[in-house]
């Protein structure tokens, strides 16, 4: 089983898809990575040679932050916004949508399950 950036790549998937299992590598970056290393996107991860794995590892480590480093950087950015008291930091602190989405309706994922309030008595 091929292992890159601390992630076991699925054996039977094409490399183009298998690389997207790494946090921080999506479809576009996966194609770019395969072009840089000269590996065919149709190759399965079980068929990779050690040299190809080493080439992939080198390009990933030298060009991009992925997995734990990227997650830490994102968390640090959120913490910084909260500390400086920006509007986005305030939204993060309150657990509300950060990027201007409406909250009168929707936003259930960010706000959590509905908290029912007793209706008005007649």
From Swiss-Prot:
Region annotated Disordered, chain positions: 93-122
Entry GO CC: cytosol; small ribosomal subunit
Gene3D superfamilies named in the record: 1.10.8.50, 30s ribosomal protein s13, domain 2 (4.10.910.10)
Classification via SUPFAM superfamilies: S13-like H2TH domain
GO molecular function: rRNA binding; structural constituent of ribosome; tRNA binding
Keyword tRNA-binding: yes
Example GO BP: translation
Keyword terms of this UniProt record: Ribonucleoprotein, Ribosomal protein, RNA-binding, rRNA-binding, tRNA-binding
InterPro entries, alphabetized: Rbsml_uS13_C (IPR027437), Ribosomal_uS13 (IPR001892), Ribosomal_uS13-like_H2TH (IPR010979), Ribosomal_uS13_bac-type (IPR019980), Ribosomal_uS13_CS (IPR018269)
Superkingdom of source: Bacteria
Keyword Amino-acid biosynthesis carried by entry: no
Subunit structure comment from the entry: Part of the 30S ribosomal subunit. Forms a loose heterodimer with protein S19. Forms two bridges to the 50S subunit in the 70S ribosome.
Record function comment: Located at the top of the head of the 30S subunit, it contacts several helices of the 16S rRNA. In the 70S ribosome it contacts the 23S rRNA (bridge B1a) and protein L5 of the 50S subunit (bridge B1b), connecting the 2 subunits; these bridges are implicated in subunit movement. Contacts the tRNAs in the A and P-sites.
Family according to the record: Belongs to the universal ribosomal protein uS13 family.
Name assigned to this protein: Small ribosomal subunit protein uS13
Organism (species): Corynebacterium urealyticum (strain ATCC 43042 / DSM 7109)
Gene name as annotated: rpsM
């Amino acid at each position: 089983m091929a292992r890159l950036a601390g992630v076991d790549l699925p054996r039977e998937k094409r490399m183009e898809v298998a690389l997207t299992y790494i946090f921080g590598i999506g479809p576009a970056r996966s194609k770019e990575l395969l072009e840089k290393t000269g590996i065919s996107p149709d190759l399965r991860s079980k068929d990779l040679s050690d040299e190809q794995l080493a080439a992939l590892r080198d390009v990933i480590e030298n060009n991009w932050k992925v997995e734990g480093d990227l997650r830490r950087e994102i968390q640090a950015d959120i913490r910084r916004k909260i500390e400086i008291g920006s509007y986005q930091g305030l939204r993060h602190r309150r657990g509300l949508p950060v990027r201007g989405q409406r909250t009168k309706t929707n936003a259930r994922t960010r706000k959590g399950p509905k908290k029912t309030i007793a209706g008005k008595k007649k």
